[in-house]
A protein has these predicted regions:
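N-terminal strand-loop-strand beta-hairpin
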Residues: 1-119, 156-184
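C-terminal accessory/tail domains of diverse enzymes
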Residues: 60, 124, 144-145
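Long, well-ordered alpha-helical scaffolding segments within enzyme catalytic domains
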Residues: 144-161
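Residues forming well-ordered secondary-structure scaffolds
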Residues: 92, 110, 131, 145-149
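Residues forming anionic-ligand binding surfaces in small-molecule and nucleic-acid pockets
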Residues: 69, 129-133
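Short glycine/proline-enriched loop/turn "hinge" motifs that connect secondary-structure elements
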Residues: 123-129
Length: 184
C-alpha cells in the first residue's frame, strides 16, 4: 500500500511514560500494545543516509512487513512516501535482500502503545537504547491540521518534550557513532 505518512515525533521529558500511558488509556481509544523488532538495510547502489530513504523489515506481534520510506518532503513534520508489503518469512526476506547486496545497518527494538484520536494514531514508544517517545501520525492528512492537532494534544495532556524530525534509526546510529568516537 502506498501513502503519504505525516508524523511528529517527540522525545518525552514529562510526565513519565507510565503516568502518560495511564492517562491516555483513561481518555482515548486504546488500540493495543506491540513489541516491534526492526531490521534496517542500506542499498548497494546508493547510501540511504545520503538520500534520506529507509528500507526495513519489521516484526510486530507475529506480523512481518517490508517497508520502503522515501525522502522526507517537509521541514515541519516527518512526511514521506511509505510503501508497506506484508511478507510471510523474515529470514527468507533477509536472505533475499542480502543476496541482492543490501547490508544490514542496525536492529532496533521497541514497545509501542497505540491510541486512536480522531483521524490520528498516537503512539507511545519505549525504544531500547533511546528512551521514551510520543508519535502522532496521520495518513494522507493535511500538514497544517496535523501540526495544530499536535500542539493542542500536547497542551491538553500537559506533555513536555522535544520535537525531532529524525527517525529512530538516525537517532540510534548517531548515538552509536558518538559513543564509538568518544575517547572517554
Amino acid at each position: 500500500m502506498t501513502h503519504i505518512e505525516r508524523e511528529v515525533k517527540i522525545k518525552l521529558f514529562s510526565p513519565p511514560l507510565s503516568v502518560l500511558l495511564t492517562k491516555l488509556k483513561n481518555k482515548y481509544t486504546f488500540l493495543g500494545e506491540e513489541s516491534q523488532k526492526d531490521i534496517y538495510y542500506n542499498s548497494p547502489v546508493r547510501d540511504f543516509r545520503q538520500t534520506d530513504e529507509a528500507l526495513r523489515i519489521r516484526k510486530s506481534n507475529g506480523k512481518i512487513e517490508l517497508t520502503y520510506k522515501g525522502p522526507k518532503i517537509s521541514s515541519q513534520s516527518k512526511s514521506r512516501l511509505e510503501i508497506n508489503v506484508e511478507i510471510s518469512n523474515l529470514e527468507d526476506m533477509d536472505k533475499i535482500l542480502q543476496n541482492l547486496g543490501f547490508k544490514k545497518v542496525i536492529e532496533l527494538e521497541k514497545t509501542r502503545w497505540n491510541f486512536k484520536v480522531n483521524n490520528y494514531t498516537i503512539s507511545l514508544d519505549s525504544v531500547k537504547g533511546l528512551g521514551d517517545f510520543l508519535e502522532i501520525e496521520g495518513i494522507d492528512v493535511d500538514e497544517k491540521n496535523l501540526l495544530n492537532f499536535v500542539n493542542n494534544f500536547l497542551s491538553e495532556n500537559e506533555i513536555k518534550g522535544e520535537s525531532t524530525l529524525k527517525s529512530y534509526l538516525e537517532l540510534l546510529v548517531e548515538k552509536i557513532e558518538k559513543t564509538n568516537s568518544d575517547p572517554n
